[in-house]
Amino acid sequence: MMDGRLLEHPHAQFGGSLGGVVGFPYPLGHHHVYELAGHQLQSAAAAAAAASVPFSIDGLLSGSCAAAAASVVNPTPLLPAACGVAGESQPFKLADSGDPDKESPGCKRRRTRTNFTGWQLEELEKAFNESHYPDVFMREALAVRLDLVESRVQVWFQNRRAKWRKKENTKKGPGRPAHNSHPTTCSGEPMDPEEIARKELEKMEKKKRKHEKKLLKSQSRHLHSPGGLSLHSAPSSDSDSGGGGLSPEPPEPPPPTASAKGPGAHGSGIAGSAPVPPGEPPAPGTCDPAFYPSQRSGAGSQPRLGRPADKDTVPCGPGAASTAGLPKASPFSVESLLSDSPPRRKATPANTAATAGLDFTPGLPCAPRTLIGKGHFLLYPITQPLGFLVPQAALKGGAGPELVPKDAPPAPPAPPAPPAQASFGAFPGPVGAADPAFARRSPEVVASPGPPAPASFRGLAAAAAESGAGDCADAGTVCPAAPPPPPLETSPGPGPRAPSPPGEPATCGAAEPGAATGSSPPEGEEVDMD
């Protein structure tokens, strides 16, 4: 192989001297030696200069050209000495090479396939493991070491990189492992098993965090939804199940020992359940702890973590423990929506409720509301109508002929008895004439212009008797039943139509207690006036 490469070099006309150097066995005749032109002499000088580099390919191939260049002028005496057998002349073919850098003046020679030996392949693989992209200096050193051409080394590295990329991009087919089943780093080196385990652990933790975030988002959606879920379901499910959002499955119902926390803990412990069943009294937080101290001490409820104090109170009412085991209604039903509003109104003090215009007195509604609510509104434990049922119960027990309608709001918390009675005369005449029943049904609206001069109810009846008995005749009642005391004076501005409110049945003597009790919830002051 080396002999053929020496003969196929561009300066192969010096084959005589080179053959003597390497012991070339074939004799060369005079027809194998060509005359040198001027440019061939220059190329010979360049090859001699290149021979100064000892480990380059050109230096190795043209090492003897410098010595042969001096004898090129007279080549004939060199031929017998170089060839050894001068008499024989055998034609020798100078083609057949594997060098693509051959500069032959004739037609192009077809390069044959390079066959690498096992040792050459082993050395090339070692170099590839060190670097996939060797520079030109490393390729030349490999070519000199492995007895190859640098261009062949370059092409081998190109093919090896393509093979490596194909192996890396191969996916696992069905039923067979992939070529790169063992994961490798970016440079192609195999990964450490500890690194593989760490990456798997990070992947699992990332998936777990994503699942926890999804659970927390769903729980916050339940927390902010309108209804009973905003008070009870999601926080109690976190505290009762213990794990909270870590468990992917829905939370289990609390164990039987959770009933020691009180009826409120057992009733609202299951996520997604409605906090108020149909037969239960008002929701937790509507009643003050002072009204039912025995239930709070007997139940022994402990404040749970993650819940405000006002949401941890037990339901006020005797039916709470009995109805705790009943199936819960829908959290978006009318009952749960209506029972969710009282705790926010209950926290307002008396003067704030009066100035804000709330429809009930905050101190009263707990105890009377549960008594009447259990008799009349079993399915709807609503706060607002129960404040109006308190005077209705008193009227039904008394001698009042009429009931106060439900649409009229109750009186404010301050004792409004003297202004309410004086308001019959202070109410303007035209409005009273247009709607006389409104002055009787809502006395606090009539008293709203301001506190008038104090005048008794009988003084108003006296003013009615002085102005004329025509209004009483229209009402069809016996008006002289109220004797007019002369010292009392009426309010300053009665007007010509001022007797129109007393002209109704509420001004008669028989209906006097009923009208007095209908004016405001505290009945004691009107009884003292009578």
Curated annotation (Swiss-Prot):
One GO cellular component term: nucleus
GO biological process: cartilage condensation; common myeloid progenitor cell proliferation; dorsal spinal cord development; olfactory bulb interneuron differentiation; pattern specification process; regulation of cell differentiation; regulation of gene expression
Region (Disordered): 90-111, 165-362, 400-530
DNA-binding region: 109-168
Expression sites by tissue: Expressed in a narrow layer adjacent to the ventricular zone of the dorsal spinal cord, preceding overt neuronal differentiation.
Alphabetic keyword roster: Developmental protein, Differentiation, DNA-binding, Homeobox, Neurogenesis, Nucleus, Transcription, Transcription regulation
Composition bias type Low complexity, residue spans: 228-240, 420-430, 455-476
Biased composition, class Pro residues, residue ranges: 248-257, 275-284, 407-419, 481-504
Subcellular location: Nucleus
InterPro entries: HD, Homeobox_CS, Homeodomain-like_sf
Domain of life: Eukaryota
Protein role: Transcription factor involved in somitogenesis and neurogenesis. Required for the maintenance and differentiation of particular elements of the axial skeleton. May act upstream of PAX9. Plays a role in controlling the development of connections of hypothalamic neurons to pituitary elements, allowing central neurons to reach the peripheral blood circulation and to deliver hormones for control of peripheral functions.
Family, similarity comment: Belongs to the paired homeobox family. Unc-4 subfamily.
Protein name: Homeobox protein unc-4 homolog
Species classification: Eukaryota, Metazoa, Chordata, Craniata, Vertebrata
